[in-house]
Regions:
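Short, contiguous strand/loop micro-motifs
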Residues: 10-11, 49-51, 70, 102, ...
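Glycine-centered short loops/turns at secondary-structure junctions
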Residues: 70-72, 146
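Phosphate-binding loop of NTP-binding sites
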Residues: 75
Length: 175
């Protein structure tokens, strides 16, 4: 994580690709994988440009379609510049009015700058806002600012004890 934190301020998809090429090259050396430069670049290219690598939660489109009728939706994501293309490829980008991406700040959740940026962009007060995530650590960051946190425990790794409201499916947001 230290490597990513030191090298996460990335503005373009090409910078992202180069960053992952360096990252995979370093990992190859560290783990003695003996990957060739060509193999490293193939892996980095696939990670950056292959939109088939990404999936959404089951029922995400249905839930987003319903929620956008009554609520302004935003996204705060620990991610890279290719996220915009990824969200469009999976058909969910247009549900979000605002977006805050960690790569634009060189910081990861739960850094408060990400939550504050999203609040500023949407013109909402923290008390009027809900933040859904699968990480308790990220929820704590939102809660410290007065944002209502909800844990989505859609997979076993995120189904942990939580002081926050917990859902197991996005469909639960519609109830």
């Amino acid at each position: 994580m230290e490597y990513l934190e030191k090298n996460h301020l990335v503005k373009t998809t090409e910078e992202e690709y180069q960053q992952f090429a360096r990252f995979y090259s370093d990992i190859s050396r560290y783990l003695n994988l003996s990957l060739t430069n060509e193999e490293v670049h193939i892996i980095a290219y696939d990670r950056t440009y292959n939109m088939n690598n990404y999936i959404v939660y089951p029922d995400a489109k249905e839930v987003l379609e319903s929620l956008t009728k009554s609520y302004m939706m935003g996204i705060i994501s620990d991610t890279w510049p290719s996220i915009e293309k990824q969200l469009r490829a999976i058909g969910v980008r247009d549900y979000f009015s605002i977006s805050t991406y960690s790569c634009s700040f060189g910081k990861f959740k739960p850094d408060e700058i990400l939550y504050k940026d999203a609040l500023s962009k949407c013109g909402c007060r923290a008390e009027e806002t809900v933040f859904i995530d699968d990480s308790i650590r990220n929820l704590e960051g939102a809660a410290k600012l007065g944002i209502t946190p909800i844990l989505i425990a859609a997979n076993p790794a995120s189904d942990v004890d939580s002081p926050y409201l917990k859902i197991h499916s996005l469909l639960e947001l519609l109830r």
